[in-house]
Swiss-Prot record:
InterPro entries: Frog_antimicrobial_propeptide (IPR004275), FSAP (IPR016322). This is Raniseptin-9. It is found in: Secreted. GO terms for biological process: defense response to bacterium. Pfam families: FSAP_sig_propep. The keyword Secreted applies. Residues 1-22 form the signal peptide. GO terms for cellular component: extracellular region.
Length: 79
């Protein structure tokens, strides 16, 4: 009977240990997924910022081009 109790205790102990290991791995996996989602959100924000910056540079380039054309026409065709 004592042998049976020890065996049962050992089985329960090993079951609890394996269960706690599985829960720990699950938590680690959830944390990794959360970090990946945060990284994706950051990259989406960075992409939006870059697009906005490129749009501003594009419009600035258009303005500078128009000014350069106006200056060139002024010097080439003085009135």
């Amino acid at each position: 009977m004592a042998f049976l109790k020890k065996s049962l205790f050992l089985v329960l102990f090993l079951g609890i240990v394996s269960l706690s290991i599985c829960e720990e791995e699950k938590r680690e996996g959830e944390e990794e997924e959360k970090q990946e989602e945060e990284n994706e959100e950051l990259s989406e924000e960075e992409l939006r910022e870059r697009r906005a910056l490129l749009d501003k540079l594009k419009s600035l380039g258009k303005v500078v081009g128009k000014v350069a054309i106006g200056v060139a026409q002024h010097y080439l065709n003085p009135q």
